[in-house]
Amino acid sequence: MKQLIIISLLIPLFTFSQLKFSDPESQGISSDRLKMITELSKSYVDQGKVANITTMVNRKGKIIYFESFGNRGLDDKQKINKDDLYRIYSMTKPIVSVAIMQLYEKGKFHLNDPVHKFIPELKSLKIAITKDSLVDAKNKITIKHLLTHTSGLSYGWSRQPADSFYRQADIFNSESSDDFIKKVSELPLRFEPGSKYNYSISTDILGILIERITGLSLSDYLEKNIFKPLGMVDTFFQVPTKKASRFLPNHAYDRLTKEINTIDSGKYEDSKKIEGSTMRNFYDVKMYSGGGGLVSTAYDYMVFAECLRNNGEFNGERIIGSKTLKYMTKGHLPSTVQGIGRGESPDDPAVSARTFGLGFGIINSPEILGVIGSKGIYSWGGAAGTIFWIDPVEEIVVVSMIQLMRSPWTLRNDLKVATYQSIVDSFE
């Protein structure tokens, strides 16, 4: 059995040549116990909880697990391939955060610089006290506020006074980056910049900041400074028509009917059908969303994540300094706003177990969180259920991809259990 596992791990070498593959035992992992990921994945697919799942596990720079299960979609019974393309949505954010910090390293700005130094449209903003009462913000949004989601900006998801303005503005149907900024400049903040944490469009603003500083489109900047150096050939904002057959359908869980429906076929010929909806069009992109616009493969994202695990370098290409990356993956929220969560419940102990760095969520206490792992794990996920995490203690990197919006499942935590229970030689 062990021989079969080793052979299956060697097969991808002919197709996926950048990352190094190894048998699990040589990396302190049990092959037999690693099967738990396979059993978990098949269970989710067989129960119809997800159409498919692709998962990669890396330890000490070697791939010890790379498998895909399921079909392309619930309405597309073609078997999934390992190089199929996923919408990674907010897993775009860590990439853009690294990109902006490349410019920081070049001395283009300081973290406490006000954003309006480069985007003057955002100089004079207001705060929504109620829907009918706006007051001038006393503080200016800084670049660090954007990186830590303490800017006061929003997504418009909640019922706070400012959020109704976001929903009306329909900012993600903007014709360009400038149009997006114009709309945002007319929206009120939720709170004084720097005073609270609120997950928001901050990284979209960072993407536009990159464009303003460099004169390049965000797409061109990422291609030149991250994707090309790392050999990430399947990561982009706009799906090339020649790769359209690999772009997977997207699904959503309906909490009322408890059904899962296809909401985007992923097909080029159907792309016009989602214009004007809340879904993004990945074929006719008008604005490059730094907060959620990228499409990628599990393999490509593993290359990026392995580069981070290896202190900013991959295959001899360094995209960011080791010290800079360590700085980014420390907790940066002040004690007054320590802890992150969807809601605003600082008394929730699970919230205190997490904090936020410069573009990454960080686990302070897996014990309080109640999920196996190590202190210092940094990670992020996407709206369609994608997830990655890097464990500096155990030298483990996991990338897992599905395409399911509003997932009610505990797949991410289940995957952590399945991964960590396979460790034979722990470094902790």
Predicted segments, located by residue:
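Short, conserved phosphate/pyrophosphate- and ester-handling motifs at nucleotide-, phospho-/glycolipid
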Residues: S30, K93, T297
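Short, contiguous pre-domain boundary segments
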Residues: Q18-S26, S164-R167
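Short, well-ordered beta-strand elements
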Residues: F388-I390, E395-L404
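Short, conserved catalytic-motif segment at the N-terminal edge
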Residues: S22-I88, S124-T130, W409
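Bacterial Sec-dependent N-terminal signal peptides
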Residues: M1-K20
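Active-site SXXK
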Residues: T38-S41, T55, G61, D84-V115, ...
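Short, surface-exposed loop or secondary-structure junction motifs
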Residues: L125-I372
